Swiss-Prot record:
PANTHER family: UPF0297 PROTEIN YRZL
Family from the record: Belongs to the UPF0297 family.
Transmembrane segments: none
HAMAP family attached to this UniProt entry: UPF0297
Name of the featured protein: UPF0297 protein BPUM_2379
Length: 88
């Protein structure tokens, strides 16, 4: 069996990073709203493309979001969505 046939485990476990991701996303969201953009569309554009031009420099939002890996942002968004919407 080649190494391409094996499932790799992807794991994040740093709770302080989770808080940081939340703070960054909220700051970026607020900055986008203040500048008159649709925050959801702009954040999705950034996550899909990796192009920081989707995020304004206002409130240092562009620099903050670039300090995080996009997969960290996506992980936090998925985790938050599932925790909010999973059935009991």
């Amino acid at each position: 069996m080649s190494s391409f046939d094996k499932t790799m485990k992807f794991n994040f476990s740093d709770d302080s990073a989770e808080t940081n991701v939340n703070e960054v996303l909220i700051t970026v969201y607020d900055a986008l709203q203040e500048k008159g953009y649709n925050p959801i569309n702009q954040i999705v554009g950034y996550l899909l493309s990796g192009d920081p031009a989707y995020i304004p420099r206002h409130q240092d939002a562009r620099n903050l979001i670039r300090k995080l890996e996009r997969d960290e942002l996506i992980e936090e968004l998925v985790k938050s969505y599932l925790e909010t919407h999973k059935e009991a």
